[in-house]
Amino acid sequence: MADYKEYLDKIRNSQLLYFDSFPLDMTSCEYNVHLLLNKMAESRKSYLLLMDNERFSDAVLIAGHLLENAAVINYISASLQEDNTKQISKYLARETVQTLCDLFKFVGDDNVDAETQETIDFIMDDFKSRCDIVVLKKAKQTHEELVQVISKATTNSEKFKIIKNNYELPVVEDYLRPLRTDLSKFYGFPDIDKKLVLFYSSYCKIKHCGAAMYAPILCEDKVVMNKSQYRDLSPIVVWMCLEYTEKNIKTILNKVCQKR
């Protein structure tokens, strides 16, 4: 298997599509896929910049972000291929729940400006129409009843608590597992699934723990960290995600456009 520099060269030569603008008549699936493709293209540039400057642990964060985007694109594409509208509805509904929770958490109970309130109202309308039984947990109340409870809540923190306790949030592993399976079949390298699990575990540790996850060694009054672990870990993951998405991009875009 190639060393990390060879994979970096392959990543440099990647030609993943980037969209400067989106058509106004896009469906939700089209918009999400185009947006995720742009995020992957932008992540590729940031990743190479960090690797070239030996910011290996920071590069892992970008690589993990790229992997998650590739996984969601693959998930949407597979659901469309199987004509599994329930899975697509579930994905979009969970994302709506997450967006609404993030908004309520970010805004808090302070007075909000008109523009922010307009955004909240817009997402709430989407939530009311989209987040029915598809993402409702085993609650005693129906979606319609919970919408009424939320509308009567006087603070954003109350609304946040009601939504979080009664509706499903996105589960990253649901998106990652199918991509791991598909990459293993596509490339046929030994232990690809294990490498991806190891990488994602390391990504989550860096993401949530930062520098505290390192085991520094004191040497001549200097803190020395093992960079090679992160230097060698991420390039193959980034390359596989980019190449696999590139090779399937026409099929993916055809699928989402057919659902207009």
Task: Kindly label every feature range from the protein language model.
Residues M1-Y31, R94-W239, Y244-R260:
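Secondary-shell segments that build the walls of catalytic and ion/ligand-binding clefts
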Residues S21-S79:
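Long, hydrophobic/aromatic-enriched structural stretches that serve as scaffold segments
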Residues D58, S77, N84-T85, Y214, ...:
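Residue-level signal for alpha-helical context at structural boundaries
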Residues A63-G64, A70-D110:
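Internal, hydrophobic cores of structured domains that mediate oligomerization or house catalytic pockets
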